[in-house]
Design a protein with these regions (language model features):
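Short, flexible loop segments at boundaries between secondary-structure elements
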Residues: 144-156
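Structural motif
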Residues: 27-31, 125-129, 156
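Small/aliphatic-rich secondary-structure junction motif
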Residues: 15-68, 72, 97, 146
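Structural beta-alpha unit
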Residues: 1-19, 91-122, 141
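Glycine-rich, Arg-bearing micro-motifs that act as flexible, cationic patches
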Residues: 124-145
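A short acidic, glycine-rich active-site loop
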Residues: 71-80
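Short helix-loop-beta junction
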Residues: 47-48, 85-95
Length: 156
């Protein structure tokens, strides 16, 4: 092998098109959001230059047919916190929206939201004290196993 071939750097592949940027989803199940999760979600959205969706999933009762027909917008305290998160994200320079959905199975419905909205990162952010340590781990594991995107936090 000649020195001319050995000293030449290999040609680096060049991407023809940019990678698609997909939004960040901050999720809670009708429980106040964790402060660290809020900061992480806003930071991830700013760093990637993508939209932040602040999502509240409400569980509908299935035992009573009349109750299942009633949709609600969630706990008013949590709704106020969602407005504050959206305001914080916009003040920091990120685009932000609220998303509320009702389902008898909110975790299963989440996978449809992730697919339909083409979410790139789910930040699972309910307050762990209110939500419960074991339930948090179980739901995080299920979301991580079935979601078509990245899921944060990495550890429960």
């Amino acid at each position: 092998m000649t020195s001319a071939v050995r000293d030449r750097a290999p040609a680096a592949p060049v991407a023809d098109e940019r990678t698609e940027r997909r939004p960040v989803l901050l999720l809670s199940f009708d429980i106040l959001f964790d402060e660290q999760a809020i900061d992480d979600a806003i930071g991830f959205a700013l760093e990637a230059g993508v939209e932040l969706l602040v999502c509240l999933a409400n569980t509908l009762p299935t035992a009573n047919a009349n109750a299942a027909a009633r949709r609600h917008m969630g706990n008013p305290v949590v709704r106020e916190q969602m407005l504050e998160i959206v305001r914080l994200a916009r003040d920091a320079g990120a685009e932000a929206q609220q998303l509320v959905y009702n389902s008898p199975r909110p975790i299963s419905a989440l996978f449809g939201v992730v697919r339909d909205r083409r979410i790139g990162l789910v930040v699972f952010g309910p307050n762990r004290r209110s939500y419960g340590r074991l339930r948090f781990r179980w739901h995080l594991r299920r979301i991580r196993r079935n979601a078509d995107c990245l899921v944060w936090p990495l550890e429960a």
